[in-house]
Amino acid sequence: MEKAVKELHRVLKPGGRALILDTDWRSIVWHSSDKARMERVLHCWDDHLADPHPPATLGARMRRAGFRVLRVGVVPMLSPRWQPVSYAAGIMKTIRGYAAANGERHGLSKEEVQAWYDDQLRLAERGEFFFSLNRYAFLATR
């Protein structure tokens, strides 16, 4: 992350603005019938990222690189009910694919990953689906 922020500062003209939007997966609130399984699936998902929690340190990293951070805002991704065309629906499929392919390193079988996915669909059918995840927007100038 340090290298990317420094490179952004290098290529941006003096006075230029940068907007970085990133997710902190610790902010997730996702209803599940099996909380332990949900934790295992999300722990597996964290492996696909170099850092699953960058917003907590991004502002300081940007300042160290020479940026002036003007504003930090939160962009919630909220699905209080099932919506087939939504971030939640899309990320469910993506996580299922990743966890099915990489879950064995975390003790997750393909069947357990599918059970996680099916649980979410059952919750949706019963009107009990809930998903929320925060993204953070950092506006800065060089």
Predicted features along the sequence, with ranges:
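Short coil/turn segments at secondary-structure boundaries
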Residues: P55-G59, Q114, S132-Y136
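C-terminal helical/coil "lid" or tail adjacent to the Rossmann-like core of SAM-dependent
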Residues: R71-F129
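Conserved catalytic/acceptor-binding region of the Class I
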Residues: R17-P84
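Core SAM-dependent methyltransferase catalytic element
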Residues: A65-R68, V85, A89, L133-R142
